[in-house]
Amino acid sequence: DLDKVPSTGENNPYMHIFLQVGQAHLAFFELPNSPEMGTDLNTPNWVQHIALKVKNNEKLLQIKNYLESLGHNVLGPVNHGIFHSIYFHDPSGHRLELVVDQELTYKGESANKVLKKLADEMLTEWSLTGEPPKHAQWLHSTLDS
């Protein structure tokens, strides 16, 4: 029965859309007979989003210009130090981020490698204290004001 949700048996006609991303897929649902879904008012708008990597800065700007030519509001590029991002919303209201890695070094080593070495320690501190770890505070000092 095409009107039944396979995992729950719930009666709710839907369209299941898959977007291939490299070796993975993102799955989206359209539920035409359901009330319009809202957002979680307790979650800031910037928190829940999907980030996808693009090839280079030129491609990032090309996509930004294309989206703007279609009438989309695009924020950025935003300098995060180790990558630059643009942000926009899809027609269903999902926030999307496109990122391109940047070459950044810290004390003569790739910033990404330094962050990977610190990851476990930072996660442990976060889990124990609930406070943002200070291990990568140096990264924020490299950002444009």
Stretches found by the model and what they are:
Residues 1-26:
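Core segments of cupin and vicinal oxygen chelate
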Residues 2-7, 33-39:
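A short, acidic/glycine-rich surface segment
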Residues 18-20, 39-43:
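Short, conserved, surface-exposed binding loops centered on an aromatic residue
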Residues 33, 43-45, 49-95, 100-106, ...:
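Vicinal oxygen chelate
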Residues 37-41, 107-110:
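A short, polar/proline- and glycine-enriched secondary-structure boundary/capping micro-motif
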